[in-house]
Amino acid sequence: MNGVSFHRLYTPYVKIQIDYGITVDVSVDQNEWADLPFEKYDCVVFNRWLGKLQYNILPVLAKKKIPFIVDIDDYWVLPKYNPAYKFYRAYIKNGIKDSLHYADAVMVTTPQLEEKVKEFNQNVTIIPNALDYNQSQWKAETEHPFTIGWVGGLSHTEDLKLLSDKIKPICEKYGARFLMCGFHENVPEWATMEKAITGEPRHKRPEWFQTRVGTKANEFGKYYSEIDICVAPLQKTQFNRYKSELKILEAAAYKLPIFVSAVEPYTNHRDNLGCFFVKNNDWSEIGKLIKSDKVKEVGEINYQYCDQHHNLDTINKKRVDLLRKVVG
């Protein structure tokens, strides 16, 4: 199960089944979707599109008068540097646009994405991301040196270039470690991302730089237990504008402060005093926070803000209200 399905479908609907007594059946195998007994369901919810079987399944739902909701958390037009660009352009982009157009309702993560989706469907509801803090991945405890950390995937090569020559002087001055989480040793792009941080080839990796290998969506959260300050650089692009603020929430789960590029969608958290907005690519404020000895205090502020504005119970109520409205 990928991260999107885990956060947008699995986590919220497991809790909905428990809290609301609503029966939720889950299928993650596309090969079985064509044979599902759709007539037994009041509503179908899926992320983005239904893959290769979409144009077989949508007519079945229409014939049986079963409403469906599309949950989407990012833009369907990828930048050319994204590893999935060609595949999306050839096979996925138009499928997503069609699913949005025919959906009875669409759930999105941010006002920015709501604006874009309304080009295809006016029945759009903002359902922000939220984490279930009771999951074990958000409860790990570790002993570690003071650490600045980044957690992410392969598509962030261009974003990490924003940290070039920025992290090294901070780590060396304050004796901090930098931890890159999501790493895969034999993938060339990761070597590029590492060099963007260290300025050195892998065989000259400095002592202050360490990595953690990529893992499953229900396990990666534990990496935040090794971090004291998070960073989330993000290029100002149309694609990134329609992403969500999930990295801020993940940092908040471990009561960590986070430094983010001052671009949308991160600026949706402009009132979050546990989140620092980096302008003109000047990351030196990280050092000032370390020196102030208020790292934990500011991390607590991030947690309190996210618990108020991205509370899973509150957001799930909104989710259930929409489900009931669509079902009628």
Residue ranges and their predicted role:
Residues M1-G21, L131-S136, E141-S225:
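Conserved catalytic-core segment of nucleotide-activated headgroup transferases in glycan assembly
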Residues M1-L50:
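N-terminal pre-catalytic "stem/leader" segment of glycosyltransferase-like enzymes
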Residues P12, D293-R324:
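A charged, aromatic-enriched C-terminal amphipathic alpha-helix characteristic of glycosyltransferases
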Residues V44-V45, H101-T110, L179:
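A short beta-strand/loop micro-motif in the catalytic core of glycosyltransferases
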Residues V60-K63, F87-A105:
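Membrane-proximal helix-turn-helix segments that form the acceptor-binding/catalytic region
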Residues Q112, A130:
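Carbohydrate-associated surface elements
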Residues E158, P206, Q210, G214-Y224, ...:
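Nucleotide-sugar-dependent
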